């Protein structure tokens, strides 16, 4: 249980909303959503744990209970929370508990961190609709969006800055290709 289970308000610019999603390694999730039309910014960080100000070593050491997650700042006139969730579910495996590929542990859990009751309802309905598309049950959690801790600078825009790194070539690039294949009309600058 997080040390603080109350939803924390996030400051956004006028005309902007925020979604907080955890779908395995934040490098992957960030790389996918940075390409999506209507998304203004994506920030990698940690949420849902039991200590304040966690760092990467602590989170990966499974000592904090935090998930690697991203905060997605988006323009609701160009996209919406349900569309973000559709991309989220199609670009990671929501049926594996605390695991995405070779990455295992609670920090890699699949979670939707909701900022309000409307997001909670949209998340539930989207999971019900998409659940029929999977052979195994969806294990994605719906959790309150507690305090989000921005990850260390070297994690931000990791794929964009390190496209030739081994993990990026082996794992992140595959997620980006999946996004491009399934959501070509949602790629920034696609004109659709």
Curated annotation (Swiss-Prot):
One of its GO terms (biological process) is protein modification process. PANTHER family: PEPTIDE METHIONINE SULFOXIDE REDUCTASE, PEPTIDE METHIONINE SULFOXIDE REDUCTASE MSRA 2. The keyword Oxidoreductase applies. It comes from Rhodopirellula baltica (strain DSM 10527 / NCIMB 13988 / SH1). It is an enzyme of class 1 (oxidoreductase). Keywords: Oxidoreductase. This is Peptide methionine sulfoxide reductase MsrA 1. One of its GO terms (molecular function) is peptide-methionine (S)-S-oxide reductase activity. The active site is at 25. It comes from the Bacteria. The gene is msrA1. The lineage of its organism: Bacteria, Pseudomonadati, Planctomycetota, Planctomycetia, Pirellulales. Its EC number is 1.8.4.11. It catalyses: L-methionyl-[protein] + [thioredoxin]-disulfide + H2O = L-methionyl-(S)-S-oxide-[protein] + [thioredoxin]-dithiol; [thioredoxin]-disulfide + L-methionine + H2O = L-methionine (S)-S-oxide + [thioredoxin]-dithiol. InterPro entries: Met_Sox_Rdtase_MsrA_dom, Met_Sox_Rdtase_MsrA_sf. SUPFAM superfamilies: Peptide methionine sulfoxide reductase (SSF55068). Has an important function as a repair enzyme for proteins that have been inactivated by oxidation. Catalyzes the reversible oxidation-reduction of methionine sulfoxide in proteins to methionine.
